Amino acid sequence: MKKFKFVLSLLLVGLIVIFVANFIKNSKTSTGSTFLVKELLTDVNNDNLADKVELYGRKNNVDDTEYLSFELTVTDGDTQMKRKFSPSFMKGSNPTLELHDFTGDKLPEIMISAEDGNKILTSIARLDQDIIKPVFQEENNEGVRLNLSFGSNFSINGSFADGKKLAVNLEHIKPALTSYGIYTPEGTYKEKDTPSITPYTSLIAMDIENDGVFELLGTQVIITKESSLPLCNLISVHKYNNGFKLTDIKYTR
Protein backbone atom coordinates (compact mmCIF):
# COMPACT_ATOMS: atom_id res chain seq x y z
CA MET A 1 0.00 0.00 0.00
CA LYS A 2 2.81 2.40 0.89
CA LYS A 3 4.54 1.55 -2.39
CA PHE A 4 1.32 2.31 -4.30
CA LYS A 5 0.96 5.68 -2.54
CA PHE A 6 4.58 6.49 -3.33
CA VAL A 7 4.12 5.69 -7.04
CA LEU A 8 0.88 7.70 -7.10
CA SER A 9 2.67 10.65 -5.53
CA LEU A 10 5.38 10.50 -8.17
CA LEU A 11 2.75 10.43 -10.92
CA LEU A 12 1.00 13.46 -9.44
CA VAL A 13 4.27 15.37 -9.17
CA GLY A 14 5.05 14.48 -12.77
CA LEU A 15 1.66 15.73 -13.94
CA ILE A 16 2.12 18.99 -12.04
CA VAL A 17 5.58 19.51 -13.58
CA ILE A 18 4.21 18.85 -17.08
CA PHE A 19 1.29 21.23 -16.47
CA VAL A 20 3.57 24.00 -15.22
CA ALA A 21 6.02 23.48 -18.09
CA ASN A 22 3.22 23.65 -20.66
CA PHE A 23 1.79 26.75 -18.99
CA ILE A 24 5.16 28.48 -19.11
CA LYS A 25 5.68 27.42 -22.71
CA ASN A 26 2.27 28.73 -23.74
CA SER A 27 2.86 31.98 -21.86
CA LYS A 28 6.08 32.57 -23.74
CA THR A 29 4.40 31.83 -27.05
CA SER A 30 1.52 34.21 -26.48
CA THR A 31 3.34 37.12 -24.84
CA GLY A 32 6.87 36.77 -26.19
CA SER A 33 10.17 36.83 -24.33
CA THR A 34 12.34 39.79 -23.38
CA PHE A 35 15.95 40.06 -24.52
CA LEU A 36 18.70 42.53 -23.67
CA VAL A 37 19.52 44.39 -26.88
CA LYS A 38 22.28 46.73 -25.68
CA GLU A 39 23.73 48.21 -22.49
CA LEU A 40 25.65 51.48 -22.07
CA LEU A 41 27.32 53.07 -19.05
CA THR A 42 27.40 56.86 -18.74
CA ASP A 43 26.31 59.69 -16.45
CA VAL A 44 22.81 60.81 -17.48
CA ASN A 45 21.77 62.67 -14.30
CA ASN A 46 24.82 64.90 -13.63
CA ASP A 47 26.03 63.26 -10.40
CA ASN A 48 29.43 62.27 -11.87
CA LEU A 49 28.61 58.58 -11.49
CA ALA A 50 28.08 56.19 -14.37
CA ASP A 51 24.47 55.11 -14.79
CA LYS A 52 23.43 51.94 -16.60
CA VAL A 53 21.23 52.41 -19.66
CA GLU A 54 19.69 49.20 -20.99
CA LEU A 55 17.49 48.56 -24.01
CA TYR A 56 15.29 45.47 -23.86
CA GLY A 57 13.23 44.09 -26.73
CA ARG A 58 10.33 41.65 -26.72
CA LYS A 59 9.93 39.06 -29.46
CA ASN A 60 8.28 35.67 -29.80
CA ASN A 61 11.38 33.58 -30.50
CA VAL A 62 15.09 34.06 -29.98
CA ASP A 63 15.73 33.69 -33.73
CA ASP A 64 13.15 36.31 -34.73
CA THR A 65 14.57 39.51 -36.21
CA GLU A 66 11.44 41.58 -35.54
CA TYR A 67 10.91 42.96 -32.05
CA LEU A 68 7.30 43.52 -30.94
CA SER A 69 8.13 46.26 -28.43
CA PHE A 70 11.01 47.89 -26.55
CA GLU A 71 11.65 48.99 -22.99
CA LEU A 72 14.33 51.38 -21.77
CA THR A 73 15.72 50.96 -18.25
CA VAL A 74 18.00 53.49 -16.54
CA THR A 75 19.67 52.36 -13.31
CA ASP A 76 21.09 55.12 -11.11
CA GLY A 77 24.79 54.53 -10.48
CA ASP A 78 24.47 55.81 -6.91
CA THR A 79 21.09 54.67 -5.55
CA GLN A 80 20.55 51.75 -7.96
CA MET A 81 17.00 53.04 -8.48
CA LYS A 82 15.53 51.85 -11.78
CA ARG A 83 13.46 54.03 -14.07
CA LYS A 84 11.67 52.55 -17.08
CA PHE A 85 10.26 53.94 -20.29
CA SER A 86 8.36 52.07 -23.02
CA PRO A 87 7.51 54.07 -26.17
CA SER A 88 4.34 52.33 -27.33
CA PHE A 89 4.94 52.94 -31.04
CA MET A 90 8.44 51.47 -31.17
CA LYS A 91 8.92 48.10 -32.86
CA GLY A 92 10.97 46.59 -35.67
CA SER A 93 14.35 45.06 -36.45
CA ASN A 94 18.02 46.03 -36.08
CA PRO A 95 17.45 48.21 -32.99
CA THR A 96 20.10 50.69 -31.89
CA LEU A 97 20.79 52.51 -28.63
CA GLU A 98 22.77 55.77 -28.66
CA LEU A 99 23.57 58.58 -26.22
CA HIS A 100 23.97 62.13 -27.54
CA ASP A 101 23.57 65.65 -26.17
CA PHE A 102 20.83 67.23 -28.31
CA THR A 103 19.78 70.00 -25.90
CA GLY A 104 23.18 71.53 -25.10
CA ASP A 105 23.02 70.90 -21.33
CA LYS A 106 26.14 68.68 -21.42
CA LEU A 107 24.06 65.61 -20.53
CA PRO A 108 23.17 62.93 -23.06
CA GLU A 109 19.69 62.15 -24.26
CA ILE A 110 18.82 58.52 -24.97
CA MET A 111 18.04 57.64 -28.59
CA ILE A 112 16.62 54.31 -29.72
CA SER A 113 15.84 53.41 -33.32
CA ALA A 114 14.56 50.40 -35.23
CA GLU A 115 13.74 49.55 -38.84
CA ASP A 116 10.03 49.02 -39.51
CA GLY A 117 9.59 47.98 -43.11
CA ASN A 118 10.85 50.77 -45.37
CA LYS A 119 10.88 53.38 -42.62
CA ILE A 120 12.86 54.08 -39.47
CA LEU A 121 11.24 54.56 -36.07
CA THR A 122 13.00 56.67 -33.44
CA SER A 123 12.36 57.66 -29.85
CA ILE A 124 14.52 60.16 -27.95
CA ALA A 125 14.11 60.68 -24.20
CA ARG A 126 15.93 62.40 -21.35
CA LEU A 127 16.11 61.98 -17.59
CA ASP A 128 14.32 64.98 -16.05
CA GLN A 129 14.03 65.09 -12.25
CA ASP A 130 14.14 61.31 -11.97
CA ILE A 131 11.53 60.84 -14.71
CA ILE A 132 12.28 59.65 -18.23
CA LYS A 133 10.56 62.15 -20.54
CA PRO A 134 10.31 61.84 -24.33
CA VAL A 135 11.55 64.72 -26.49
CA PHE A 136 11.09 62.99 -29.87
CA GLN A 137 7.82 61.10 -30.13
CA GLU A 138 5.61 59.13 -32.51
CA GLU A 139 4.36 62.10 -34.52
CA ASN A 140 7.92 63.30 -35.12
CA ASN A 141 8.63 60.12 -37.07
CA GLU A 142 6.44 61.26 -39.96
CA GLY A 143 9.25 63.62 -40.93
CA VAL A 144 8.91 66.84 -42.88
CA ARG A 145 5.38 67.37 -44.18
CA LEU A 146 4.63 69.59 -47.16
CA ASN A 147 2.14 69.86 -50.00
CA LEU A 148 3.54 68.58 -53.29
CA SER A 149 2.37 68.92 -56.87
CA PHE A 150 3.86 68.32 -60.30
CA GLY A 151 4.74 71.45 -62.25
CA SER A 152 5.58 72.06 -65.87
CA ASN A 153 8.86 71.02 -67.48
CA PHE A 154 9.55 68.01 -65.22
CA SER A 155 9.39 69.69 -61.82
CA ILE A 156 7.75 69.50 -58.40
CA ASN A 157 6.37 72.43 -56.46
CA GLY A 158 6.41 72.08 -52.68
CA SER A 159 4.84 74.35 -50.08
CA PHE A 160 5.20 74.27 -46.29
CA ALA A 161 2.61 75.27 -43.70
CA ASP A 162 4.56 78.48 -42.97
CA GLY A 163 4.39 79.55 -46.61
CA LYS A 164 7.94 78.62 -47.60
CA LYS A 165 8.43 77.01 -51.00
CA LEU A 166 10.55 74.18 -52.39
CA ALA A 167 11.23 73.71 -56.11
CA VAL A 168 12.49 70.33 -57.35
CA ASN A 169 13.97 69.77 -60.81
CA LEU A 170 13.24 66.28 -62.20
CA GLU A 171 15.18 66.51 -65.47
CA HIS A 172 17.41 63.67 -64.29
CA ILE A 173 14.52 61.17 -64.50
CA LYS A 174 12.80 62.54 -67.61
CA PRO A 175 12.78 59.12 -69.38
CA ALA A 176 11.03 57.45 -66.44
CA LEU A 177 8.44 60.23 -66.12
CA THR A 178 7.57 59.97 -69.80
CA SER A 179 7.49 56.16 -69.84
CA TYR A 180 5.13 56.16 -66.84
CA GLY A 181 2.89 58.57 -68.74
CA ILE A 182 3.20 61.34 -66.16
CA TYR A 183 4.72 63.85 -68.60
CA THR A 184 4.83 64.22 -72.36
CA PRO A 185 8.32 64.22 -73.92
CA GLU A 186 7.98 68.00 -74.18
CA GLY A 187 7.49 68.36 -70.41
CA THR A 188 3.73 68.83 -70.17
CA TYR A 189 2.18 67.32 -67.05
CA LYS A 190 -0.61 64.93 -68.07
CA GLU A 191 -2.55 65.17 -64.79
CA LYS A 192 -1.66 61.55 -64.05
CA ASP A 193 -0.38 60.48 -60.63
CA THR A 194 0.77 62.89 -57.92
CA PRO A 195 3.93 63.21 -55.81
CA SER A 196 3.96 62.23 -52.13
CA ILE A 197 6.60 61.92 -49.43
CA THR A 198 7.53 58.96 -47.25
CA PRO A 199 8.28 59.01 -43.52
CA TYR A 200 11.95 58.92 -42.55
CA THR A 201 13.91 56.17 -44.26
CA SER A 202 16.98 57.26 -42.29
CA LEU A 203 17.42 59.43 -39.20
CA ILE A 204 20.88 59.82 -37.72
CA ALA A 205 22.42 61.92 -34.95
CA MET A 206 25.22 64.17 -36.16
CA ASP A 207 27.23 67.02 -34.64
CA ILE A 208 26.94 69.16 -37.76
CA GLU A 209 28.28 72.37 -36.23
CA ASN A 210 31.10 70.55 -34.38
CA ASP A 211 30.12 72.17 -31.08
CA GLY A 212 29.35 69.02 -29.08
CA VAL A 213 25.60 69.43 -29.55
CA PHE A 214 23.98 66.96 -31.92
CA GLU A 215 21.36 67.56 -34.59
CA LEU A 216 19.14 65.08 -36.42
CA LEU A 217 19.80 64.46 -40.11
CA GLY A 218 16.76 62.91 -41.76
CA THR A 219 16.22 61.36 -45.19
CA GLN A 220 12.82 60.97 -46.84
CA VAL A 221 11.89 59.96 -50.38
CA ILE A 222 9.55 61.83 -52.69
CA ILE A 223 7.69 59.25 -54.77
CA THR A 224 4.71 59.07 -57.09
CA LYS A 225 1.61 58.19 -55.10
CA GLU A 226 0.16 55.53 -57.40
CA SER A 227 3.22 53.93 -59.01
CA SER A 228 5.70 54.52 -56.13
CA LEU A 229 8.33 55.76 -58.58
CA PRO A 230 11.22 57.32 -56.59
CA LEU A 231 11.72 60.92 -57.70
CA CYS A 232 14.35 62.31 -55.31
CA ASN A 233 15.53 62.30 -51.70
CA LEU A 234 14.64 65.04 -49.24
CA ILE A 235 17.37 65.77 -46.69
CA SER A 236 16.45 67.75 -43.57
CA VAL A 237 18.30 69.00 -40.48
CA HIS A 238 16.54 69.39 -37.13
CA LYS A 239 17.99 71.19 -34.11
CA TYR A 240 16.56 71.00 -30.59
CA ASN A 241 15.04 74.21 -29.23
CA ASN A 242 12.10 73.34 -26.97
CA GLY A 243 11.44 70.55 -29.44
CA PHE A 244 13.19 69.57 -32.65
CA LYS A 245 12.90 72.38 -35.21
CA LEU A 246 13.61 72.22 -38.93
CA THR A 247 16.69 74.33 -39.70
CA ASP A 248 17.69 73.24 -43.21
CA ILE A 249 16.26 71.25 -46.11
CA LYS A 250 17.38 70.29 -49.61
CA TYR A 251 16.71 67.63 -52.22
CA THR A 252 19.19 65.26 -53.80
CA ARG A 253 18.98 62.90 -56.73
Q: PLM features: what roles do these ranges have?
A:
Residues 18-87, 184-190, 194:
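Terminal domain-start segments
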Residues 46-56, 103-114, 211-219:
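Acidic/hydrophobic-patterned starts of short beta strands in beta-sheet-rich repeat architectures
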Residues 94-97, 110, 221:
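N-terminal post-signal-peptidase region of extra-cytosolic proteins
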Residues 1-29, 115-253:
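Acidic, small-residue rich beta-repeat scaffolds with periodic aromatic anchors
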Residues 35-44, 94-102, 150-155, 202-208:
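Beta-propeller blade termini
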Residues 80-102:
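Blade-loop segments of beta-propeller domains
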Residues 67, 92, 231-233:
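Short, solvent-exposed coil/turn segments
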Residues 49-54, 94, 196-204:
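Short small/polar-residue motifs
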